[in-house]
Amino acid sequence: MTLWVLGLNHQTAPMELRERASFVGDALPRALDSLRNLPNVNEAALLSTCNRTELYAETTNAQMLLNWLEQHRPGLQNHLYQYSDAAAVRHLFRVATGLDSMVLGESQILGQVKDSWSMARTHGTLGNTLDRLFQHSFSVAKHARTNTRIGTNPVSIASTAVRLAQDAFSPLNESTVLLIGTGETIQLAAKHLSEGRVQRLLIANRTHAKAQMLASQHGGYALPLTELNLHLAEADIIFSATAAPTPIVTQSNVESALHIRKRKPMLLFDLAIPRDIETEVGTLTDAYLYTIDDLERAVEENRRSRREAAETAEAIIELQVKRYMDTLQAHAHQAPLRRLRTFGTTTRDELLTRARQQLANGRPAGEVLEQLAHGLTNRLLHPPTAALREAALANNTELVRAAEQLFPEKPGYHHPTLQTTIVKTDETDPAS
């Protein structure tokens, strides 16, 4: 059986294709049930997020997995990557650590990998191999994130702005934040702010229904954009990212708000292009304005820091891949060793029981011991001897060389001529 991963992600497929490839809601457990019924597939797990869909499986037939994927999500073949064994292990470790993410080092993916593992366990498609692999990936991700700065600095405009706001108004649970717009940047800011337990969140948008929807998701209050100036003075922090062609927050608006606030400072983040906030706002006393250019410099510094941390994380992963594969190989070798030991102990017990019975029947101890010794020798040595003879005839030097390593010839020692000794007994010894 070989470990395989088949998948696509943001690097190999556009958004519309990733959406079509995903397994969400009830589709995921149904897919796992289908995979469980495939012949020659021992184990399987599905990782499906907005940026990737990946199938992990232990199987002897990778083509069967490709056929299954084509049947359930047609049209993906030209966008798929596939890895096996050590490459598959390395890929999962990189995914769990955030090194394969659209945002380098993001931590959300680790939770999604854990969800994938949990779902596969629940539906009975996870066995020892994938269970051990996924759990090891969790440890690797934790180790990499603990020992590097791969996830410490924000690398999106929105998250960097929120981090600056937290530094300026700590804690946020004593601050009122006003969000203007409901696009992707504002949605991300709202997510980070709600995680920071902001005291009060106001959301203003031209389409009031969209503001209400975003507000309901994060415990905020929706405002029509026409009432924006009525609420400016309430805001300690403002994030704005709309598609307006001209500024919607003017110098005079902010000046009036500062007057009402009795000069209590305001922090403003203009995350829009073209600008939502007049540049003159930055000249006002007690108003601190950050634009995308200001934030981009901080973001690029953070990205550089993460790239440096990623190099260290990659080295950690390479070491962990080697350790994991060594462990896997050791486990693979344990099965024949267990069979060998079982064969030896079973043979010993069987012949020892017979010897005791013969002694109880009054047979001379010397004869019984001699038969026991010869029986053990013949029974234990017959399988390897026959295998070595066949290997020699087939020119299988690998097996012969292994035997030479196990039983090296000592200096001055000469092998006696191979003879078969038959000990006459009251009954025929099946081991002879």
Curated annotation (Swiss-Prot):
GO terms for molecular function: glutamyl-tRNA reductase activity; NADP binding. During catalysis, the active site Cys acts as a nucleophile attacking the alpha-carbonyl group of tRNA-bound glutamate with the formation of a thioester intermediate between enzyme and glutamate, and the concomitant release of tRNA(Glu). The thioester intermediate is finally reduced by direct hydride transfer from NADPH, to form the product GSA. It comes from the Bacteria. The active site is at C50. GO terms for biological process: protoporphyrinogen IX biosynthetic process from glutamate. Catalyzes the NADPH-dependent reduction of glutamyl-tRNA(Glu) to glutamate 1-semialdehyde (GSA). The gene is hemA. Pfam families: GlutR_dimer, GlutR_N, Shikimate_DH. This is Glutamyl-tRNA reductase. Homodimer. The keyword Cell division does not apply. The record marks H91 as: Important for activity. Possesses an unusual extended V-shaped dimeric structure with each monomer consisting of three distinct domains arranged along a curved 'spinal' alpha-helix. The N-terminal catalytic domain specifically recognizes the glutamate moiety of the substrate. The second domain is the NADPH-binding domain, and the third C-terminal domain is responsible for dimerization.
